[in-house]
């Protein structure tokens, strides 16, 4: 699911919570950020601890607690 956000570093967040992603359905999700259709590879707070740490063209955040995502969306949803 891709959700529009108002954030200085990103304009959308992808949230995946199926069994085929790095998550625990119902408790945590895998997320990624995008700006103008491109991956945001720089860690975004408050999710930096979940950033995959890879250097490259993509960046995902694994096993992010859904409560943390919900709080972020409460403040940043477009």
Give residue spans per PLM region.
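Catalytic phosphate/metal-binding cores of nucleic-acid and nucleotide-processing enzymes, i.e., regions
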Residues: 1-78
